[in-house]
């Protein structure tokens, strides 16, 4: 073949290859631009958090709220119910302008992390975290995003490192505290059991709020003539043996809002009944299950106030980072007459009957 013709053919082939490559590259750039444009769409809800992130989940004109609940038991379910009610009072109603994605971790921190990361991946407008572990995990997942976290059912946000000593936020997170009315609880137990000396408390070592509650109980107990006997567990599997052990050392048990122990409350109540040792609860649902009495909060109300806070954040009326967490001063006396009678105890006047 003539060398000059050969060189011309090679040059022509190279030119065609470059032309095709250029066209392919242009097509790819157009696809990338189109994809970026879609992912950058914003909600029409007017949410400040959505506007700032520019890429959060929407469903038509609805805002999307992810509710992560660490465990499933009465008080936490009541918080969730109240939260949705509070959102409605703030103008966000399911089926109208609100979509809720609810996930329960089953008291598993690994699953809780998956839930939080899933909310981030879906780019929800706001995360509601129920309990301390869920709030800590959710805040950690959302910290580098514009997604606000609003928590509830947290005993001590400061100890959980979600708030500062003055109640202000450490970041794009706020919520409500269900701090126990410890002195009122001890006063109630003293009225019901005037001769009691030792109160037992079971708690899980992985829940920082529980450790703080036990510490506060131990500090306040002497004022009411009590000594607190504590028994730690590391998981729900430890609860049966731990309950057997502590019941031999105390006059009664006082159950706090420890998720691990509350999840095993039926076991605790059964063993306590056989031992003839009454159990006092920390909120209404525990009393319904068989605890004698409690100076506790109405968790539907706690959740409702949390929902109202979340609605303000979604509307852009406030930023989670600028809102101090809320606490509740008032506590009601709930009593289970049937449980009290089974131990030969008399409930104080003015209690609210919440038996089964």
What are these regions (language model features)?
Residues 312-356:
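Hinge/cleft segment of the Venus flytrap/periplasmic-binding protein
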Residues 59, 63-90, 101-110, 206-207, ...:
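Extracytoplasmic "Venus flytrap"
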Residues 23-55:
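Bacterial lipoprotein signal-peptidase II cleavage site
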Residues 104-164, 258-277:
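Beta-alpha junction/loop-to-helix N-cap segments that form part of ligand/metal-binding clefts
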Residues 65, 83, 174-221, 323-339:
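An alpha-beta-alpha
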Residues 58-59, 156-198, 297-318:
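Hydrophobic alpha-helical segments within soluble ligand-binding/sensing domains
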Residues 137, 142-182, 281-293:
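Flexible loop/hinge segments that line or gate small-molecule binding clefts
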Residues 99-121, 232-246:
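Structural motif
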């Amino acid at each position: 073949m003539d060398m000059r013709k050969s060189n011309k053919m090679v040059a022509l082939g190279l030119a065609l290859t470059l032309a095709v490559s250029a066209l392919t590259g242009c097509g790819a750039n157009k696809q990338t631009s189109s994809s970026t444009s879609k992912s950058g769409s914003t909600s029409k809800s007017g949410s400040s958090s959505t506007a700032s992130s520019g890429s959060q989940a929407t469903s038509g004109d609805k805002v999307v709220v992810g509710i992560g609940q660490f465990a499933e038991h009465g008080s936490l379910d009541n918080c969730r119910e109240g939260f949705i009610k509070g959102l409605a009072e703030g103008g966000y109603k399911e089926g109208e302008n609100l979509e809720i994605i609810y996930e329960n971790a089953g008291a598993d921190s690994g699953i809780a992390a998956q839930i939080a990361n899933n909310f981030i991946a879906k780019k929800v407008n706001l995360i509601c975290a129920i309990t301390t572990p869920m709030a800590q995990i959710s805040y950690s997942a959302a910290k580098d995003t514009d997604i606000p976290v609003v928590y509830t059912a947290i005993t001590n946000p400061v100890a959980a490192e979600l708030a500062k000593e003055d109640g202000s936020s450490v970041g794009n997170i706020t919520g409500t505290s269900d701090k126990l009315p410890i002195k009122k609880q001890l006063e109630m137990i003293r009225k019901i059991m005037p001769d009691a000396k030792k109160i037992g408390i079971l708690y899980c070592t992985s829940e920082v709020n529980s450790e703080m509650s036990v510490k506060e109980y131990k500090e306040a107990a002497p004022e009411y003539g009590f000594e607190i006997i504590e028994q730690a567990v590391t998981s729900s599997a430890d609860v049966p043996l731990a309950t057997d052990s502590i019941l031999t050392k105390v006059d009664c048990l006082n159950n706090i809002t420890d998720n691990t122990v509350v999840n095993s409350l039926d076991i605790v109540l059964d063993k306590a009944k056989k031992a003839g040792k009454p159990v006092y609860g920390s909120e209404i649902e525990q009393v319904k299950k068989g605890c004698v009495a409690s100076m506790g909060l109405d968790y539907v109300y706690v959740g409702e106030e949390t929902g109202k806070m979340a609605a303000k954040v979604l509307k852009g009326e406030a930023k989670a980072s600028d809102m101090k967490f809320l606490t509740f001063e008032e506590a009601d006396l709930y009593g289970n007459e049937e449980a009290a009678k089974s131990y030969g105890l008399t409930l104080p006047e003015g209690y609210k009957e919440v038996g089964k």
